Amino acid sequence: GIGAKLLAALPAHEEGAKAILIEAECPEKADDEAMAVRRLGFYARCGAVDTGWTEHLFDAWFRVLVLPAKGETLDAETANKELADCYSRVMGADKWRRYVRLYRPDGTEEKF
């Protein structure tokens, strides 16, 4: 459908990007678990890889996914460091540390 076409075209619009980072709602924390599972399936069919990391952003929980761009990709650790850096720059360090938490697959919090 159109969503898959849009997602497939996105890397071409981000020149120089190794990957596109996607935050998808965690099914086990979602109001609509079935919809969240379908979204994860959609992203997987489009080539996105679940890093195994989760993110707590304000009051919502997300899985961190990586969509490779131009045959390149980011490993899970680097992807999450980049995500943390993005939020820190956009929100400012104080708000970022207050409202954003990243967790490794084993559940331990990572403070980049």
Predicted regions and their residues:
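Conserved acetyl-CoA-binding loop-helix of GNAT-fold acetyltransferases
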Residues: G1-E15, V37
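Terminal substrate-recognition subdomain of acyl/acetyltransferases
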Residues: K18-F112
